[in-house]
Swiss-Prot record:
This is ATP-dependent 6-phosphofructokinase. The lineage of its organism: Bacteria, Bacillati, Bacillota, Bacilli, Bacillales. Its EC number is 2.7.1.11. GO terms for biological process: canonical glycolysis; fructose 1,6-bisphosphate metabolic process; fructose 6-phosphate metabolic process. It comes from Bacillus cereus (strain B4264). The gene is pfkA. The keyword Metal-binding applies.
Amino acid sequence: MKRIGVLTSGGDSPGMNAAIRAVVRKAIFHDIEVYGIYHGYAGLISGHIEKLELGSVGDIIHRGGTKLYTARCPEFKDPEVRLKGIEQLKKHGIEGLVVIGGDGSYQGAKKLTEQGFPCVGVPGTIDNDIPGTDFTIGFDTALNTVIDAIDKIRDTATSHERTYVIEVMGRHAGDIALWAGLADGAETILIPEEEYDMDDVIARLKRGSERGKKHSIIVVAEGVGSAIDIGKHIEEATNFDTRVTVLGHVQRGGSPSAQDRVLASRLGARAVELLIAGKGGRCVGIQDNKLVDHDIIEALAQKHTIDKDMYQLSKELSI
């Protein structure tokens, strides 16, 4: 293999730049040229492709976002549109592609693989919802961003004796809510994977109040429903002074944590190794702190699951 491409797609996550850097430097170490594809699959279709050198990825390992930019490209689901992308890859002499992103990005890589072009997926999403890996690039940074925000909100909640409902990202996966809620001692954690009884939530809050608790924190993943509606329901049912905070896109930004930088470096380099070995159609991950790779089609057939033991622990500790 003489030449590979790399792109980032979908929602950005801290550590994507570290992964790009690892792909470029690992490939050049093996005398392979690397071409960056800008704006994800949209840039692939339009031919926004440029050669990357060692200097192209200097001074980016500590930066959030993605040097290659990113975009969503729903039209890439069309086989004819994908053929245009493959034509662009062949036009530039690119023989393999590293795709850094989440579920939608993996779907694109899977489709390219099925159409005969070798791709390797690298899990880059703050949601931590990609099958075949314990952690995704960006999750740890986003988690620490959320924890820092909740710590600050708890200070004001304590001062004003208020109940706070805090909405975090996670449309289909509750990992951010669960990990942050457990780390911050939230009184209640609501996630899409687990049904909840609003009457039980209110009863828990009232029990806390009866034993002298002056404030409470409820962490809600966005996929559960409107945090504003949940906050109104709580205030009406308890008469507690209740506020709602939606953390939003602040969770995606910021300098990546050491863990995300190292994870991204390991996974990006491993993706290049797989392409060199002629193993396209794979996705890389980390399980039990060991690098692994899976068939991307088989991986996407699996479903991300929440850590049931951790969820149960959060309930037991929030009595």
